Regions:
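Flexible cytoplasmic inter-helical loops of multi-pass small-molecule transporters
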Residues: 5-6, 212-232, 429-435
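Extracytoplasmic gate region of multi-pass secondary transporters
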Residues: 45-49, 168, 240-292, 384-385
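Conserved MFS/SLC helix-loop-helix module at the cytosolic interface between two early adjacent transmembrane helices
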Residues: 76-114
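Helix-to-loop junctions at the C-terminal end of transmembrane segments
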Residues: 77-89, 291-304, 392-393
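Cytoplasmic membrane-interface "Motif A"-like loop-to-helix N-cap segments
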Residues: 87-98, 300-313
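Glycine-rich segments within core transmembrane alpha-helices of 12-TM secondary carriers
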Residues: 150-176, 374-385
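C-terminal membrane-cytosol helix-exit motif in multi-pass small-molecule transporters
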Residues: 176, 198-221, 418-423
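C-terminal transmembrane helical hairpin of 12-TM major facilitator-type secondary transporters
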Residues: 303-355
Length: 436
């Protein structure tokens, strides 16, 4: 009479597994929504840089100072952000981050002075770096199975890109309607854009705080808390060579992404109107879900690190194309290159956190590891805006951007070498473990 038991257990196991999968994907979708809503307001320059310079009456260099300061705050926040992610409930950190970022955006919409802009960007660095960053990445790593790391991180970056693209499309429509249909000033149009992003952040934050963490995540956090020892765990992480190679890859890959922030100004310098350049850069944003999710899927199907290497090589060559193609006078080729770079950089962003799984880092200190990688990997936030501002002010027009994109391409070569080295180490470890 006991024979039917296994069949019953099988029927019980399948719904449980499906329920677990649905729960994990639902959690991922919430994180995608939060990540997609919070960052665009900080980086409106990638679509509206020329407009921002006019509205706030600042120079390229002053805009560079603002983003350099933002990057410095990020740099100082990443390590404690990892510590917070290991110690405090993520949903409260995310709620605070979204609401604070949105509230600062409302101040931003009033077109404050340079001093006010410095305060806003500094506080944005805390609200999106200290309390938000590592908690989101750690939660994704926790809810993804080992075989799903590329897919989940790809969905995170690609999905947030989809959210960003949707918001950017609506924002550009508002801006075009205000400035072209209603003949309002650029300042009025820009204010509508900022309002959109600010209120969306606040609304999503209020929704997310009402949702409780799954019991499994709460239990994991409790176990981690009892085992946490900062100095011991730092020493453990420092001794992992693969972690430093991942750090180098993130550092170089982030250079590629930073270059895309200047595409709007670059295209306007090539003769496009603000709306046309904004349209092209918005199309580029739509490459994020394709590049992020597609890159993650290919990474899980083949190899995260191998797909990443291919993407790094292609985007490096495309950066060289931005230097060469303008001389050919083919605007269509230039636009295609800009969109292709967007596709590849988003694939890179979707993959370089997935390869962290190859470092065999204990889950209880994953947040700390993310903090360490972020401190060095996102160091470009502190100096690339200064380099870009200096070169475009010192050498106006195509010459300045040729120098800038040439530097980015050189760093892309270094990133490719780091990725090749990491793949060699991973393959060597696998070979040794098989006992061959």
């Amino acid at each position: 009479m006991s024979k039917p038991a296994p069949a019953v257990q099988g029927f019980d196991a399948a719904p449980a597994a499906n329920s677990d999968k649905a729960s994990r994907y639902f959690q991922l979708m919430l994180l995608v929504l939060a990540a997609g809503a919070i960052y665009p307001i900080l980086y409106l320059r990638q679509v509206y840089q020329t407009t921002m310079l006019e509205v706030f009456q600042i120079s390229h260099s002053e805009l560079g100072y603002l983003y350099s300061m933002l990057g410095t705050i990020f740099l100082l926040s990443y390590l404690p952000s990892g510590w917070l992610a290991d110690r405090l409930p993520p949903r409260f950190l995310i709620f605070f981050s979204l609401v604070a970022t949105g509230a600062l955006g409302l101040w931003y919409s009033t077109v404050p002075s340079m001093t006010g802009l410095m305060i806003i960007f500094g506080c944005w660095g805390l609200s999106t770096g200290l309390t938000f960053w590592a908690s989101v990445l750690k939660r994704v790593k926790m809810i993804a199975h080992h075989s799903e790391q590329g897919r989940f991180f790809g969905i995170l970056d690609g999905g947030r890109g989809l959210v960003e693209a949707l918001l950017a499309t609506v924002a550009l429509g508002l801006f075009a309607y205000a400035t072209e249909t209603r003949s309002q000033t650029a300042a009025e149009g820009f204010k509508h854009v900022v309002y959109l992003y600010s209120f969306v952040c606040i609304a999503i934050g209020c929704v997310l705080v009402l949702l409780k963490d799954p019991k499994s995540m709460a239990q994991t956090a409790a176990v981690e808390k009892g085992k946490f020892n900062l100095l011991t765990d730092l020493a453990t992480l420092v001794k992992i060579p693969e972690l430093w190679l991942v750090t180098a890859i993130v550092f170089c890959g982030y250079h590629m992404f930073w270059a895309t922030y200047s595409f709007s100004d670059y295209l306007q310098g090539s003769g496009m109107t603000a709306v046309m350049a904004g349209t092209i850069t918005t199309i580029k944003l739509w490459m994020r879900p394709i590049g992020g999710i597609g890159g993650g899927w290919l990474g899980d199907k083949f190899s995260n690190i191998s797909v990443l290497i291919v993407a790094l090589i292609l985007v490096t060559l495309a950066m060289v194309g931005l230097i060469v193609f303008p001389a050919a006078g083919n605007l269509g080729l230039l636009i295609g290159t800009v969109i292709f770079i967007g596709l590849m950089t988003y694939a890179i962003r979707g993959l370089y956190w997935a390869i962290l799984d190859s470092c065999n880092i204990p889950l209880r200190i994953t947040g700390l590891a993310i903090g360490i990688v972020s401190v060095v990997g996102y160091l470009p936030d502190t100096f690339i805006p200064l380099i870009n501002g200096y070169l475009t002010d010192k050498y106006p027009g195509q010459v300045g951007y040729n120098l800038y994109f040439g530097y980015i391409a050189f760093v892309g070569v270094l990133g490719t070498l780091a990725a090749l080295t990491l793949r060699a180490r991973i393959n060597r470890k696998k070979f040794n473990q098989t006992g061959a």
